[in-house]
């Protein structure tokens, strides 16, 4: 029988926002509320410092996310070297929630050493426009998922 690992946000596996409480979209389901409950780490040094403290205090990992830009992307790029360092210097699991990605961004995420990618696959064009406030299409979500799958090791 296959085992499914579940990581609930909490003290040992907190959610961390690379944008603090900032978000360009303010989607209908969140309007920034979820971001306010996340640990802010708006610079790579802040993320590294938080990760070191989390491990010292018995943490098991973190969800790295944040608010989206106007294109539906979480600005993870500047944090990729920090993710690599966290993976090299701690035992923490890193789950990244990047939003929409290009093929190049998918490869860079895979190269960062992140353990997991959390991806929202939204295929309803009305929901994308009215709930997420994005001028994107279902195909953009499919292309992003494809980019992540192609970049995934193994």
Task: Label each PLM-derived region with a short phrase.
Residues 1-39:
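N-terminal [4Fe-4S]-dependent radical SAM core
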Residues 4-7, 16, 49, 58, ...:
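Structured catalytic core of nucleotide-sugar glycosyltransferases
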Residues 32-47, 54-78, 86-149, 154:
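Core AdoMet radical
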